[in-house]
C-alpha cells in the first residue's frame, strides 16, 4: 500500500475512533436537543439554524431534512437556515457588520419558544455568538453544536440550552461528528413523531 492510501485510511480510522468516543459523551445532549426541538415544533414553533462555511452547509442540510424529510415520509417541519438569503446577508453585512448577519434575522424571525441551532466548530464565530445572545433576548432555546471546548459560545449558554460539544480540536473531525449529530437529531425526532423503525 502506498503512502497516499495509508494517509487516506488514517482519515477513516481517526474519524471512526472519534465517533465511537463521541457516542459515549454526546448521546445525552443529543437526546436533550431532540426534546427541545419536539417541544418547539409541537407548540407551533420553528428552528432557526446558522453557521459559517462548512457549518453553514450543515445548517442548510438540517433545514432541508426538516422541511422535506430525513428517511421517512412525514409532514414538513418548520426550519430555516439563516445563511441562505444572499440579499439579507449582504444588506446586513454592509449596513451593519458581518457579526450582525444572524442576530438581526433572529430578532426579526424568532419568537419565544423557538429554537436556534447554532453551529460553530470553534465556538468563537462572532456572528453565531451574537445570534445566541439575540435568541436569549427572544426567550428562545439554543442548541449549540461546537468543538474545542465550546469557546465563547459555550460560556454564553444557559441551563435551558443544550451544548453538543465534540471532544476534538481538528475542524474536519468536528464537522464529521456534527453532521452525524444532525442525522441523529432528525432520526430521533421522526421516531418520536412516527414511531420506531429499525436502523438498517
UniProtKB/Swiss-Prot annotation:
* UniProt main location, coarse: cytoplasm
What EC number(s) has UniProt assigned to this enzyme? 5.3.1.28
**Residue ranges the record marks as coiled coil:** none
Q: Which reaction does it catalyse?
A: 2 D-sedoheptulose 7-phosphate = D-glycero-alpha-D-manno-heptose 7-phosphate + D-glycero-beta-D-manno-heptose 7-phosphate
Where along this sequence does the record place binding of substrate? 52-54, 65, 94-95, 120-122, 125, 175
Tell whether Metal-binding is among the UniProt keywords. yes
Name the Pfam families for this protein: SIS_2
Any one Gene Ontology cellular component term annotated for this protein:
cytoplasm
According to the lineage, what is the superkingdom? Bacteria
Q: Which residues bind Zn(2+)?
A: 61, 65, 175, 183
HAMAP family, from UniProt? GmhA (MF_00067)
Protein's recorded name: Phosphoheptose isomerase
- What taxonomic ancestry is recorded? Bacteria, Pseudomonadati, Pseudomonadota, Betaproteobacteria, Burkholderiales
Q: Which gene encodes it?
A: gmhA
Amino acid at each position: 500500500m502506498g503512502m497516499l492510501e495509508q494517509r487516506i485510511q488514517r482519515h477513516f480510522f481517526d474519524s471512526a475512533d472519534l465517533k465511537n468516543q463521541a457516542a459515549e459523551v454526546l448521546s445525552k445532549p443529543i437526546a436533550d436537543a431532540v426534546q427541545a426541538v419536539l417541544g418547539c415544533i409541537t407548540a407551533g414553533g420553528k428552528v432557526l439554524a446558522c453557521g459559517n462555511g462548512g457549518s453553514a452547509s450543515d445548517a442548510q442540510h438540517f433545514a432541508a431534512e426538516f422541511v422535506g424529510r430525513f428517511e421517512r415520509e412525514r409532514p414538513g417541519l418548520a426550519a430555516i437556515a439563516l445563511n441562505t438569503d444572499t440579499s439579507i446577508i449582504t444588506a446586513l453585512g454592509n449596513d451593519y457588520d458581518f457579526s450582525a448577519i444572524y442576530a438581526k434575522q433572529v430578532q426579526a424571525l424568532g419568537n419565544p419558544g423557538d429554537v436556534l441551532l447554532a453551529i460553530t466548530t470553534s465556538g468563537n464565530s462572532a456572528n453565531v455568538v451574537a445570534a445566541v445572545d439575540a435568541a436569549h433576548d427572544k426567550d428562545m432555546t439554543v442548541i449549540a453544536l461546537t468543538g474545542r471546548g465550546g469557546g465563547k459560545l459555550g460560556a454564553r449558554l444557559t441551563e435551558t440550552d443544550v451544548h453538543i460539544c465534540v471532544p476534538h480540536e481538528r475542524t474536519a473531525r468536528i464537522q464529521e461528528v456534527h453532521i452525524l449529530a444532525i442525522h441523529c437529531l432528525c432520526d430521533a425526532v421522526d421516531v418520536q413523531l412516527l414511531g420506531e423503525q429499525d436502523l438498517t
